[in-house]
């Protein structure tokens, strides 16, 4: 009996000394990469899309309330809601694929952020359109706003409507904006109509990820995790390239100086983008992309990525544009080289490509 107990104890000790233990860090394997990718979708991509939709609906509700009581207090609420919407967009803009970018001509991202299309600031086009609609006679119904071209709608149009008076003066003084709305009843119809359309576009993205993507019977989440993408590319490659392209766009198109010029929210947008990228890379306590890189022997690369993100935060906090530009470019490079190399991913991109 004693010998039997001793043998059992020895076997138990030996079994505890072999294989992986519960507290061991995950190894860089295909299964763990797939698990990290699932976490990325469920804890980063879809939450970013949902948060943007939620804030779009909040902004839409605020426009209705503002137009029911046009005063400076409600204007402040309206502008604050737009600021939050803009920041949420920069979280989601890292993931410009799937439902957000599923049409060569009418991709939803173009109707949300026209600057992303080719780096053109369409503010004067938007101003002219608003002036024409205020004095026009066309029916400002749902169909009208659904048919608006990308360069006359979206976040930019809502910023112009929320932060300045129409007409040649383009005053940013709150009392002037209030007077402009009071004197031009159609302006509230323009505001609420465009807000409703943006919320509809945000909803399309969430529905595509969670319920049904285009003509497929499956949500994009399922298609993405099963590696059944529209263009035949690899899912992890698509994710990494999407983030890299957003970083490239931020510098190449001078987003810091060309975006959100009326609200002054561009720095906040950059902060939102970096917050999201860190969430994506760090994952959770079970598995993360950076953790898998460390497990694969790329600790130096991980340290470099984390240092760059920290420096970007310093640049944002101190409003150091030169430092920000330099380190956004560094992080762009990390997504081209260190991160895919550390995850054993072939990107297949031309490093000279831009947005």
Question: What is each of the regions a protein language model found here?
Answer:
Residues 14-16:
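C-terminal motif of bacterial Sec signal peptides marking the signal peptidase cleavage site
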Residues 23-355:
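Mature extracytoplasmic or organellar-lumen-exposed domains after removal of signal/transit peptides
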Residues 1-2, 151:
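Generic alpha-helical segment signature
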Residues 2-9:
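Sec-dependent signal peptide recognition
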Residues 18-22:
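Bacterial signal peptide processing site
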């Amino acid at each position: 009996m004693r010998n039997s107990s001793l043998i059992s104890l020895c076997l138990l000790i030996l079994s505890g000394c072999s294989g992986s233990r519960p507290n061991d860090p995950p190894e860089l394997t295909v299964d763990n990469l797939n698990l990290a990718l699932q976490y990325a979708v469920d804890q980063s991509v879809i939450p970013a899309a949902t948060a943007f939709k939620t804030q779009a609906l909040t902004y839409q509700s605020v426009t209705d309330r503002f137009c029911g009581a046009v005063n400076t207090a409600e204007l402040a609420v309206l502008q604050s809601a737009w600021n939050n919407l803009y920041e949420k967009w920069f979280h989601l803009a890292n993931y410009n694929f799937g439902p957000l970018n599923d049409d060569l001509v009418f991709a939803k991202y173009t109707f949300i952020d026209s600057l992303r299309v080719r780096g053109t600031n369409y503010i004067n086009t938007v101003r002219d359109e608003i002036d024409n609609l205020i004095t026009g006679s066309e029916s400002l119904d749902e169909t009208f706003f659904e048919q608006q071209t990308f360069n006359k709608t979206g976040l930019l149009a809502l910023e112009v409507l929320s932060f300045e008076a129409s007409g040649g003066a383009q005053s940013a003084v709150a009392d002037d904006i209030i007077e402009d709305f009071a004197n031009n009843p159609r302006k509230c119809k323009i505001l609420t109509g465009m807000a409703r359309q943006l919320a509809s576009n945000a909803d399309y993205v969430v529905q595509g990820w969670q319920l049904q993507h285009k003509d497929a019977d499956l949500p994009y989440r399922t298609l993405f995790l099963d590696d059944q993408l529209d263009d035949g590319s690899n899912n992890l490659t698509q994710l990494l390239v999407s983030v890299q392209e957003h970083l490239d766009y931020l510098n190449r198109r001078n987003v810091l100086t060309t975006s959100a010029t009326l609200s002054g929210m561009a720095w906040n947008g950059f902060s939102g983008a970096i917050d999201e990228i860190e969430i994506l890379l760090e994952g959770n306590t079970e598995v993360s992309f950076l953790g898998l890189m460390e497990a694969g022997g790329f600790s130096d690369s991980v340290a470099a990525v984390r240092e760059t993100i920290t420096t970007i935060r310093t640049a944002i906090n101190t409003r150091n544009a030169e430092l920000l530009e330099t380190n956004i470019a560094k992080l762009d490079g990390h997504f081209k080289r260190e991160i895919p190399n550390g995850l054993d991913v072939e990107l297949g991109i031309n490093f000279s490509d831009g947005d």
